[in-house]
């Protein structure tokens, strides 16, 4: 099972997005977001949902329960 903080960083870096840009989407600071990626602070569920939507991946993938990104179903 992969560490969700590594998945957060990998997904962000794969898309060439900096921490500040993600922090704005989450309505937080770059410093706070950095703490989420480093595992120094727990990621709120609201932020998890937002990141899954942003990256178009399932929560199972983000949390490391699966290695298949499983795109979210379109409504």
Where would I find each of the regions flagged by the language model?
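Conserved amphipathic alpha-helical interaction elements at protein-protein interfaces in regulatory
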Residues: 10, 14, 28, 54-57, ...
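Short, charged recognition helix plus adjacent turn
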Residues: 63-75
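Recognition helix of helix-turn-helix/homeodomain-like DNA-binding domains
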Residues: 26-42
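Conserved hydrophobic/aromatic packing and binding residues within compact polymer-binding modules
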Residues: 8, 22-23, 33-36, 62
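Hydrophobic side chains within well-formed alpha-helices
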Residues: 4, 8, 58-59
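Short basic helix-loop element that most often maps to the first helix and adjoining turn
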Residues: 6-25
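DNA major-groove recognition helix of helix-turn-helix/homeodomain DNA-binding modules
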Residues: 27, 46-61
């Amino acid at each position: 099972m992969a560490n969700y903080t590594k998945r957060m960083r990998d997904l962000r870096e794969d898309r060439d997005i900096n921490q500040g840009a993600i922090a704005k989407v989450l309505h937080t600071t770059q410093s706070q977001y950095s703490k989420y990626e480093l595992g120094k602070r727990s990621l709120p569920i609201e932020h998890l949902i937002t990141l899954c939507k942003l990256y178009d991946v399932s929560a199972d993938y983000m949390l490391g329960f699966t290695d298949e990104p499983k795109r979210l179903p379109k409504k």
